[in-house]
Amino acid sequence: MFKITLKRSRPTGKAVRGTMTIPFTQRPVNDKPEQDAVLDTLENADFIIPAGTYPLERTWSPKFKKLLPLVGDVPDREGIRIHRGTIPEHSTGCILTDARGSACLDVLFNRLENYYDNEPIQLQILGQETL
């Protein structure tokens, strides 16, 4: 199982910044170890999901018309995704990353699908349990 970790910092206005770590080093490809990817995230302070551990899978997004990571089992919510974005006020619960973050997530899911028999992924969110 792969675990992605999101560590939130304190909110600044409507923005909650965080750092997402994607552990590429858990299994090397072609005997070449890779470094973890560390990404910046943004969330809307009014709509953040509770801290905890959630299943993460890549599914088709009708809104964005492409495959995107979907955060599962969020209490009283659905459709929470991780996608590119820079303005937290435009989000109603999704976790925003920059273009590099979206590309890193694509690489991770492609590797899981192509090399590791679709091994499950978990998203662990730490910090800011209640705002």
Task: Label each residue range with its predicted role.
Residues 1-121, 125-131:
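Cell wall/extracellular polymer interaction/catalysis modules
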